[in-house]
Curated annotation (Swiss-Prot):
A motif (DEAH box) lies at residues 192-195. This is Dicer-like protein 2. Belongs to the helicase family. Dicer subfamily. Its EC number is 3.1.26.-, 3.6.4.-.
Length: 1534
C-alpha cells in the first residue's frame, strides 16, 4: 500500500483498528445528536447547502461555469475526522467537499469513487475534472465494455497513471473478485450513498469477503470514506452500527460547527394539495376496448414462441410450453398485455384522452417499426393484431383530464416565483404523457419549458420491449435542465438520489412518495430560499396529511413495515449459504462465492456456446425434489438442481448437480451453477481470474500488425568470399553450361569460388521478350587446392565483363568475386576490336563476332545485314548526325546495340527489348555504320552475351549463397538437402528474382494451419471449437510469425530488393577495403507480412523436402512456444493417436449410419468417430453423452485444405499454377456453397418405394368413396435417393425446416448448376447464392474428412472419400478446362479496389416489399455459405416475405455500373450485381486501353517525325492522351 500521509505507519494503524477499538465517544457523540432539540434529519439529511458565493442571477451562469468550491468550517471538521479513521459522513451534498479534500491532499495511491448509478457517476466525474484538473480521473461504466476486459494487461493499460476512478459499485466488486484491481493498489475508497451497503450489496460483499479478511491478515488495505444523506433507514440505531461494521467505519456528522451547518439549511415550505376523488369513469375507452378485443383474438397456438416449442418435441420444451400456454407467457402476450395495463393506468390517473393518446402513439410506433428493417416473427405476429385496430383521430390538445391532473396544472400556474422545478411521477409511462400535457395545455405551455427523465438503467440480457414508448433522452434532458433550456423536469425516482440538479424552488409529488427515504430525498431537491414542496394527496383531511410531521411519521411507519416484511423474507433464506465453500485462486486472489456462480456460468456459456442459430446457448436447470430430512423442523421439501451446459462442451463437462439440498429453487440453482463453474475451472476452461479461458492466457498477445517494421539489412556473402580469395587454400568448382538461343553448341565454363559453390536450379536470363540464355550448374562439385604463390589458374571473368561493359564504364584488371573459365578457348581483353572488319566472315561463320564503332569507346553492335553502299537517310530510323559526310561507296552494316536491360530474370517488355524493333513508316534500318569506322572482336559474339548476363548471374549466386548460409547454419538441424528450394523460399516477388516464395508460402500457410489445428486439438481435448479456433488464430497470425522470424534471425536472409539499374562491378579488392572500416549495424524497412511470409515459405520448402514430418520440425524450430503456454508442437502421428484414443470405444453404429459407412467403402475402427462427425450440436445436447461434429469439423477443414493444396502443387511444367491461381482454386472448391452442393449431389444409397399410380383415378381417391380402392396394381415402384446430407443427425425443427426449403431450391436449380460447371466450365456463384445452403451442409463434409483421418491416419483414405463425393473430380475438371473460378465479389475488389475513392464500390439492395434494406460496401472475403451462427454476412435463411423479390444497384466511384432485378435472396442480388459490374468494368477498361495504345502509337510516330524535323528547326507536336481522372485526380478504372 502506498504511504498514507495521515500517519507514519498506516498499515499498523489499519491493522490495530477494529470494531472493538473504535472510540466509544464517537458513537456517543453521534447518538447524542438525537437527543438534542435539532432533529437528526435536520442535522444530516436536510443539510442542504447554498453556494459559498452569491448565486448568479442567470441560471446558465450558475451551472455552466463551475465555481471553485470553498470549504466551510463544518466541512473541514468532517475532513479532519476522515483523516484519523474510516468514517461515514452524514451530510447531503456538502459531503462531496469532504471527499474532494482527500484527493487534493493525498499525494500517492489511487482513489476509487463509487456511486449507485451511471448518471451519478458521470456527474461526480465531471465535478472532479473541473475541480482538480491536475489529476487524471476517469469514469468506468458498462458502456465502456468493462465486462469484456478479461486480461490484466487491459486493466493495467486503462488505469495507467490514473489517480481517481469513478464507477458504479459492481465494477469495483467484479474487478477485485477477478483480481484485476487489488485492494492494496488503492489508498482510498469513497462510497457515495453509503446507506445502500447492506445484505448482498456489491460493496457490502467487497468489505466482508475481501477487505475485512485482508485487514485481519495484516495486509495493506485502503481507507474508507462513506458519504450519505441518511445512514438511518429506520429509527433503530442498530442499523447504524450494522452499517459501521460492514464498512469498518464510524458515522460522523458535524458537532462543533453545527450552527454554521444550520445556517446553510433551507427548509422548503410544504403544502398538501388535495385533488379529491378521481372523478373519472374507469370504463375503458372505445379504442381500449378495440385493443383488448384484438388481444383476445390472438390465437396463441399460432404464436411463434409456441410454434417453436411445439416443434422441438423435447421434455424440456413440453414443460415450458405447458407453462407458457397456462400463463400466456409468450413475448407477444406479455407486450400486448403490458400495453393495455398501462393504458388502464393512464385512463384512471389522467383521463380518457390520455389513454387514447398513449395507445395511438404506441400502436403507430409499433407499426412503423414493423415497416422498417426485418422484425422478428413475434413482432410480425403482434403486427397482425395491431393492423386490425382502427386508429381514431384524437385532439392534439389535452382534454377530459382527471381532477388530479387539473390540480397539478393549477399548482403550476399559481406558482409565484420564476419556476425551476421537478415534478416527481411514480410510473414511467406517465412521465411522457404528463410532460406532453404541461407542454401543450394553455395554463402552462407558455410558462414552462418542460422535459422528462426516466433513468438510464437496463437489465442485462433482457430483451427490449418494442412497445415501450418511454423516451431514452435522459442525459440530454438533464443537461438541458442544468443549462436552463428547460425550467421544469418531469421525472421518476431516478432524480431522488445523488444526481446534481440546479437549485430548485418548486418540487411537486404527483404521487405519494413510497417510503421515508424517497420523501426526504425529494424534499431535499427544493434548496432555494422560499422554495415550496407540494404533496398531492387524494384527501387533505386525512390524518396522514395534517402536517408534514404527521406525514413523515406515517411514512416512517410504512417504511418500517416494508423493512419488517423484507426481514421476514430474509429469514426464509437458508443460513447455510454463508458456510458454502468459496472458489478462490491462490495465484491471483480471484474468488467466487455461490452468490456469483450463476452470473459467471451464464457469461461462460454465452462465450463458448456453439455459434449455431439453432441452439439455446444458456445453461438449462432441472429441479427435482428429494426426501425431506425427518429431523428438520417442519420437514420442508428439499430440492436439488442439475444444470446442463451447451453441446459445444465435452460430454463429461455438460452435466453437473448441486452439492447440497436446499429449500428453494434459487439456492439449488446457485449451488449447481457453482459446481459446474468449479468443474470448468478444474478442466482448464476457466482461467486464474475465474473468467472463460482465452488463448491469450497462455500465449501473450503481441498487439496489432504494425504494417512495416525495421529489420536487419540483407546478409551479404561477398565479403566472406573476398576474404577467402585472399586467405583460403582451397577452391571449389562446378561446370557451368550456357545455352544461347540460336547457337547450336552450348558454351561451357568452370565456375570457381573459394567457398563451396552452391548448386543452383537451371537459370533463365532473358535476352529479350521471347528468348533467354539458360545457365545450368552441374550437380557435381570439385575441390582443389591453390598452388602457393600462383593466381590459381586462368580467369576469363575480366574479359567477359569487358566485352559487354567496357564501352559504358572502365573495367579494371582486378579480381571479380566469381571466376569463370572457358573450357574451349582462351578469352582475353586484347581480342576486343582486334580485327579489321571482314564482311565475308559474316557470310560464312555460324558465330560471327561483334563489331565495334571505333570512337574511343568501342561501342559494340550485332550485325544484322551488310549493305554494299550508304543507304538514303530517309530509310534510317536513327541516322548519325554526320550521315551526309560519311563515305558513299563503301560497305555499310545494319546493326543493333546490346540492350542495357538484357540479362533479367523475367522477360523484357517492349520498351527494353532491342530486338523488338520493326520497320515502320518507311524506316527500313534502325542503325547503319560504315565499314570504315568499325572493327571486329577476335571471338564470337556469344561470349559478349555471356558477359552481359554476368550481373544477373552474380545476383543469382548471391541469393544461393545467402540461402546456403541459412540452410547449413541456422537450419542445419533440419538437414534439408534442396538448396534451390530454400533459395526460392527467401526471394520476394518485389526482388524481381528468378523465382519467388509465393507458391511455397501458400503451401506453408496450409501446412502450418494443419499443424496448429491438429496439435491444439490433441493437447486440449476439453477445449471447445471456438477456443481451438483461438489457438489456431494465435499460432498462425502474422504478428506472431513476424516476431518469430525476427527472433530466429530470418530477417537478414530475406531477399526483397531488386537489382540496381545502374550496375557496376565490385571487385575483391573493394570488399577487402570495406572490411577494414568499422562495421555499422544497418537496417531496412520491410512489410511485416513479408517477414511473416518467409516463415511459411520455409515451412513449405521443408514439406517439399521431407514431407509433413520435416515440415513439423521446421514449425517447431521457427515457432517455439514458451513452456508456460502449455502448448508444445508434437509429432503428427502422436497427435492423431491421442485424438483416436479420446474417441469413445465400443460405440455401436446405428442402422441410420450403416449405409453411409458402406457407401464410403471405408470401415471405421472406432464407430464413435463417424457418429460424432454426423451429429449436429442440436442432437448432442440435453441428456446425451455424445459429442457434436464441431471439433472434427475444425480439424477436417485444415485436412481438406492440405489435400486440395497438394493436388494444386502437383500441377507442374506448363500447367504449373501461379500463386494467385492456386489461391483462387482453393478458395473456390472448399467454399461452403460448393461443398453443400456436393453434399446434396452425393447419393449414398437408393431405397425402393411404392407410390400411387398418378394415372389411376380410383387409387387417387378421385372416384366416389364407395368405388375407391387401392390394390397392388395401383402402386408404382420407384427408387428414392438418399443423399449424404440426410445422414446428419439433429434434433431441431428449425434445421429440418431449413433442410426442406433448401432441398426444394436445390432441385429447382440443380440442372442449371451442373450445366454451368460441367458444360460451360464456370462456377455459377449467383445460382449457388440463390440456392442459399446453410453452413451445416459443408460442416459435415469437413467433419467426415476429419473423422476418417483421425481413424485411419491415411491421406489416401480421405482423398478416396473426396473422390466419391465429387470434390476432387470437380477440382480436376476446373484445372483441365482452365475454368474461371474467381468469385464475383473478389474479382470486383480487384477491378475496383474499395479503398480508392475513384473506384469505391457501393451496393444498394432493394426489396419490392420493404424498399431499400441495405446499402454500403459489402463483400465476403472468402465466398461461402452463411455460418449458422453469429456471423456478419446476411443469413440465407432470413425468409423473405411472400412474393418478395430483390434488386441491387452497384455503384463504382459514384457511377452506376449494374442494376439487377428478380433475385430470390439478397445474396443472389449482390452476387449478380457484382458479376455484371465486373463485365462492365472490364469492357470499359478494354476500350480505354485500346485508346491509350493508339494514342501512344501516334505519339511515337510524331516523335520520329519530330526527330527528323529537329534538324530543320522544327519540333514534333505532342499527342494528348484522354484524361481518365476524376475531379480528385484519381485514375478511374485504369
Amino acid at each position: 500500500m502506498d504511504q498514507d500521509p495521515r500517519k507514519d505507519n498506516p498499515v499498523e494503524m489499519d491493522v490495530d483498528r477494529d470494531d472493538s477499538s473504535q472510540d466509544p465517544d464517537d458513537n456517543e457523540s453521534f447518538k447524542s445528536a438525537l437527543d438534542e432539540p435539532l432533529d437528526l434529519k435536520e442535522l444530516y439529511q436536510d443539510a442542504l447547502e447554498k453556494p459559498s458565493e452569491e448565486p448568479s442571477e442567470e441560471l446558465n451562469d450558475q451551472v455552466s461555469t463551475p465555481a471553485a468550491l470553498t470549504a466551510r468550517a463544518y466541512q473541514l471538521e468532517m475532513f479532519e475526522a476522515s483523516l484519523k479513521q474510516n468514517i461515514i459522513v452524514a451530510l447531503f451534498s456538502d459531503r462531496v467537499m469532504v471527499a474532494d479534500g482527500h484527493w487534493q491532499w493525498q499525494d500517492s495511491g489511487r482513489i476509487w469513487f463509487l456511486t449507485p448509478t451511471v448518471a451519478l457517476a458521470r456527474q461526480q466525474h465531471r465535478v472532479l475534472q473541473s475541480q482538480i484538473p491536475s489529476v487524471k480521473a476517469i469514469m468506468l461504466c458498462g458502456q465502456d465494455g468493462v465486462d469484456s476486459w478479461s486480461e490484466q494487461a487491459v486493466w493495467d493499460a486503462v488505469l495507467l497513471n490514473v489517480r481517481i476512478v469513478v464507477s458504479t459499485y459492481q465494477i469495483l466488486f467484479d474487478a477485485n473478485a477477478h483480481s484485476f484491481v487489488r485492494l492494496d493498489s488503492l489508498s482510498l475508497i469513497v462510497i457515495d450513498e453509503a446507506h445502500n451497503c447492506s445484505g448482498s450489496h456489491p460493496i457490502a460483499r467487497l468489505m466482508t469477503e475481501a477487505y475485512l479478511p485482508a485487514k485481519k491478515a495484516g495486509l495493506p488495505v485502503p481507507s474508507i470514506l462513506g458519504l450519505t444523506a441518511s445512514p438511518l433507514k429506520s429509527n433503530n440505531l442498530a442499523d447504524i452500527e450494522k452499517l459501521e461494521q460492514v464498512l469498518d467505519a464510524v458515522c460522523r456528522t458535524p458537532t462543533i460547527h453545527r450552527e454554521e451547518l444550520l445556517a446553510h439549511v433551507n427548509r422548503p415550505e410544504m403544502l398538501v394539495v388535495s385533488y379529491g376523488d378521481s372523478g373519472t369513469d374507469p370504463t375503458p375507452t372505445d379504442l381500449m376496448t378495440r385493443f383488448l378485443e384484438a388481444y383476445h383474438r390472438l390465437d396463441i397456438s399460432k404464436d411463434p414462441d409456441v410454434l417453436l416449442l411445439k416443434a422441438q418435441r423435447t421434455e424440456r420444451a413440453r414443460e415450458k410450453l405447458r407453462q407458457m400456454i397456462t400463463k400466456k407467457d409468450t413475448l407477444a402476450q406479455k407486450e400486448l398485455r403490458g400495453v393495455y395495463n398501462r393504458a388502464l393506468l393512464v385512463r384512471r390517473e389522467i383521463g380518457p384522452w390520455a389513454a387514447d393518446y398513449y395507445l395511438t402513439r404506441t400502436v403507430s410506433h409499433m407499426l412503423a417499426e414493423l415497416e422498417r428493417g426485418e422484425p422478428p416473427a413475434q413482432h410480425r405476429y403482434i403486427g397482425e393484431a395491431l393492423r386490425s385496430i382502427p386508429i381514431p383521430a384524437i385532439s392534439k390538445e389535452p382534454i377530459q383530464l382527471s381532477p388530479k391532473v387539473q390540480t397539478l396544472l393549477k399548482v403550476l400556474a399559481s406558482h409565484q416565483q420564476d419556476p425551476v422545478g421537478i415534478v416527481f411521477v411514480k410510473e414511467r409511462v406517465m412521465v411522457s404523457i404528463v410532460t406532453h400535457i404541461i407542454s401543450t395545455h394553455p395554463l402552462t405551455k407558455d410558462r414552462y419549458r418542460t422535459a422528462s427523465m426516466i433513468g438510464t438503467a437496463s437489465v442485462p440480457g433482457k430483451a427490449r420491449n418494442h412497445m415501450d414508448m418511454t423516451k431514452k433522452e435522459d442525459m440530454t434532458s438533464l443537461e438541458g435542465f442544468r443549462l436552463g433550456r428547460f425550467n421544469l423536469l418531469v421525472a421518476t425516482s431516478v432524480l431522488e438520489e445523488g444526481i446534481d440538479v440546479p437549485i430548485c424552488n418548486l418540487v411537486i409529488c404527483f404521487d405519494e412518495p413510497s417510503n421515508i427515504k424517497s420523501f426526504i430525498q425529494r424534499r431535499g431537491r427544493a434548496r432555494e430560499v422560499s422554495s415550496t414542496l407540494y404533496l398531492m394527496v387524494q384527501n387533505a383531511s386525512s390524518e396522514s396529511a395534517t402536517d408534514w410531521h404527521n406525514l413523515e411519521r406515517l411514512m416512517k411507519e410504512r417504511y418500517e413495515d416494508e423493512m419488517r416484511q423484507n426481514a421476514e423474507l430474509e429469514l426464509l433464506d437458508d443460513p447455510r449459504i454463508g458456510s458454502y465453500p468459496v472458489l478462490e485462486v491462490e495465484s491471483t486472489g480471484a474468488r467466487m462465492t455461490i452468490r456469483d456462480a450463476r452470473s459467471h456460468l451464464n457469461h461462460f456459456c454465452a462465450k463458448v456456446s456453439s455459434r449455431s442459430r439453432y441452439l439455446q446457448k444458456e445453461p438449462y436447470f432441472v429441479i427435482r425434489q428429494v426426501n425431506p430430512d425427518p429431523a428438520s423442523p417442519g420437514r420442508r421439501t428439499l430440492l436439488q438442481a442439475t444444470v446442463h451446459l451447451p453441446a459445444s462442451l465435452a460430454p463429461d463437462l455438460r452435466r453437473h448437480e448441486s452439492l447440497w439440498t436446499w429449500t428453494s429453487e434459487k439456492l439449488a440453482i446457485m449451488d449447481a451453477s457453482f459446481q459446474a463453474y468449479k468443474a470448468l475451472y478444474n478442466a482448464g476452461l476457466v482461467n486464474e481470474n475465474l473468467l472463460p479461458t482465452k488463448v491469450s492466457d497462455f500465449l501473450a498477445d503481441l498487439g496489432d500488425d504494425p504494417g512495416h517494421i525495421w529489420v536487419k539489412t540483407q546478409f551479404d556473402p561477398w565479403p566472406e568470399v573476398a576474404y577467402a580469395w585472399q586467405e583460403s587454400s582451397s577452391l571449389y568448382s562446378r561446370r557451368l553450361t550456357v545455352l544461347v538461343p540460336g547457337v547450336e553448341n552450348p558454351l561451357e565454363f568452370e565456375f570457381i569460388l573459394p567457398v563451396p559453390v552452391p548448386y543452383m536450379a537451371p537459370l533463365k536470363l532473358w535476352w529479350n521478350a521471347t528468348s533467354a540464355l539458360t545457365l545450368i550448374t552441374s550437380p557435381e562439385m570439385q575441390e582443389f587446392r591453390k598452388q602457393e604463390g600462383t593466381s590459381a589458374g586462368p580467369d576469363h571473368s575480366y574479359a567477359l565483363l569487358a566485352m559487354a561493359f567496357a564501352h559504358r564504364f572502365p573495367i579494371q584488371g582486378r579480381q571479380y568475386p566469381i571466376r569463370l573459365v572457358s573450357t574451349r578457348r582462351k578469352l582475353d581483353v586484347d581480342g576486343i576490336a582486334a580485327l579489321e572488319f571482314d564482311p565475308r566472315l559474316y557470310e560464312s561463320s555460324p558465330q560471327p563476332p561483334l563489331v565495334r564503332l571505333v570512337d574511343g569507346r568501342n561501342m559494340p553492335y550485332f550485325v544484322t545485314k551488310i549493305l554494299p553502299s550508304k543507304p538514303p537517310v530517309e530509310l534510317i530510323s536513327k541516322p548519325s548526325t554526320d550521315h551526309a559526310d560519311l563515305p558513299e561507296n563503301v560497305p555499310y552494316v545494319v546493326c543493333k546495340p546490346i540492350g542495357k536491360a538484357v540479362g533479367q530474370f523475367i522477360p523484357l517488355d517492349a520498351a527494353q527489348d532491342q530486338d523488338s524493333w520493326t520497320p515502320k513508316n518507311g524506316k527500313l534500318y534502325r542503325k547503319v555504320l560504315p565499314s570504315t569506322q568499325i572493327r571486329m572482336d577476335n571471338f564470337p559474339a556469344v561470349f559478349a552475351q555471356v558477359g552481359a548476363v554476368i550481373p544477373a548471374f552474380t545476383r543469382a549466386v548471391e541469393m544461393s549463397l545467402v540461402a546456403a548460409d541459412l540452410m547449413y547454419n541456422r537450419l542445419g538441424c533440419l538437414q534439408l538437402d534442396n538448396l534451390p528450394l530454400i533459395t526460392t523460399a527467401l526471394i520476394s516477388s518485389g526482388s524481381r528474382g528468378p523465382t519467388n516464395y509465393e507458391r511455397l508460402e501458400f503451401i506453408g500457410d496450409t501446412i502450418l494451419k494443419f499443424c496448429a489445428c491438429l496439435t491444439a486439438s490433441a493437447l486440449f481435448p476439453n477445449h471447445h471449437e471456438r477456443l481451438l479456433s483461438q489457438w489456431k488464430d494465435k499460432l498462425v497470425n502474422n504478428v506472431r510469425l513476424c516476431r518469430a522470424s525476427r527472433d530466429f534471425g530470418l530477417d537478414e536472409y530475406i531477399i526483397n530488393s531488386a537489382a540496381s539499374k545502374k550496375w557496376r562491378p565490385k571487385f575483391v579488392e573493394d570488399y577487402m577495403d570495406e572490411m577494414k572500416s568499422p562495421i555499422s549495424a544497418e537496417t531496412r524497412q520491410m512489410s511485416s507480412k513479408m517477414v511473416a511470409d518467409v516463415v511459411e515459405s520455409l515451412i513449405g520448402a521443408a514439406y517439399m523436402c521431407g514431407g509433413m514430418s520435416k515440415a513439423l520440425e521446421c514449425v517447431a524450430l521457427l515457432l517455439p512456444t514458451p513452456k508456460s503456454s502449455q502448448f508444445k508442437w508434437q509429432e503428427i502421428e502422436l497427435s492423431r493417436t491421442q485424438l483416436f484414443e479420446f474417441a469413445p470405444k465400443d460405440a455401436i453404429l446405428s442402422k441410420q449410419l450403416e449405409p453411409l459407412e458402406k457407401a464410403m467403402d471405408y470401415t471405421f475402427n472406432k464407430k464413435s468417430l463417424l457418429i460424432e462427425a454426423m451429429t449436429h450440436p442440436s442432437c448432442a445436447g440435453l441428456g446425451t453423452n455424445e459429442s457434436c461434429y464441431e471439433r472434427l469439423e475444425f480439424l477436417g477443414d485444415a485436412i481438406l485444405d492440405v489435400i486440395v493444396v497438394k493436388r494444386l502443387m502437383a500441377e507442374t511444367g506448363p500447367n504449373e499454377l501461379a500463386h494467385n491461381d492456386m489461391h483462387e482454386h482453393l478458395s473456390s472448391v472448399v467454399t461452403a456453397d460448393i461443398m453443400a452442393f456436393l453434399a446434396m449431389e452425393w447419393v449414398i444409397m437408393q431405397t425402393d418405394i411404392n407410390e400411387i399410380d398418378p394415372t389411376n383415378l380410383d387409387a387417387l381417391g378421385l372416384l366416389p368413396s364407395s368405388q375407391s380402392r387401392i390394390t397392388p396394381a395401383s402402386l408404382v415402384s420407384n427408387k428414392e435417393d438418399w443423399p449424404f446430407w440426410r445422414f446428419m443427425r439433429h434434433n431441431s425443427p428449425q434445421v429440418g425446416a431449413t433442410q426442406t426449403a433448401t432441398i426444394e431450391r436445390y432441385l429447382t436449380l440443380r440442372d442449371e448448376i451442373r450445366d454451368a460447371i460441367w458444360k460451360h466450365n464456370t462456377l455459377p456463384w449467383a445460382l449457388l447464392a440463390r440456392m442459399g445452403p446453410q453452413k451445416f451442409y459443408s460442416d459435415i463434409v469437413e467433419s467426415l474428412i476429419g473423422a476418417v483421418w483421425v481413424d485411419s491416419g491415411s491421406w489416401k483414405a480421405c482423398e478416396d472419400v473426396l473422390t466419391q463425393m465429387g470434390l476432387l473430380p470437380l477440382l480436376d475438371h476446373l484445372l483441365e478446362t482452365k475454368a474461371h473460378v474467381m468469385h464475383p465479389n473478389v474479382e470486383l475488389q480487384i477491378l475496383a479496389p474499395p479503398n480508392k475513392r475513384a473506384t469505391r464500390t457501393e451496393f444498394v439492395i432493394i426489396s419490392n416489399k420493404r424498399g431499400i434494406i441495405s446499402s454500403g460496401t459489402e463483400f465476403l472475403d472468402e465466398p461461402s455459405a452463411v455460418d449458422d451462427g453469429l456471423v456478419s454476412v446476411e443469413p440465407y435463411d432470413d425468409t423473405p416475405e411472400h412474393d418478395e423479390v430483390f434488386s441491387c444497384k452497384l455503384f463504382v466511384g459514384g457511377k452506376q455500373v449494374a442494376d439487377v432485378t428478380g433475385a430470390a435472396t439478397k445474396e443472389e442480388a449482390r452476387v449478380r450485381a457484382a458479376e455484371k459490374g465486373c463485365l462492365v468494368i472490364k469492357a470499359e477498361r478494354k476500350v480505354w486501353n485500346e485508346a491509350k495504345a493508339a494514342a501512344k502509337e501516334d505519339k511515337g510516330h510524331n516523335t520520329e517525325n519530330g526527330d527528323a524535323n529537329a534538324d530543320n528547326g522544327q519540333s514534333g507536336e505532342k499527342e494528348e492522351v484522354p484524361d481518365c481522372r476524376d475531379a480528385d485526380g484519381d485514375t478511374v478504372m485504369n
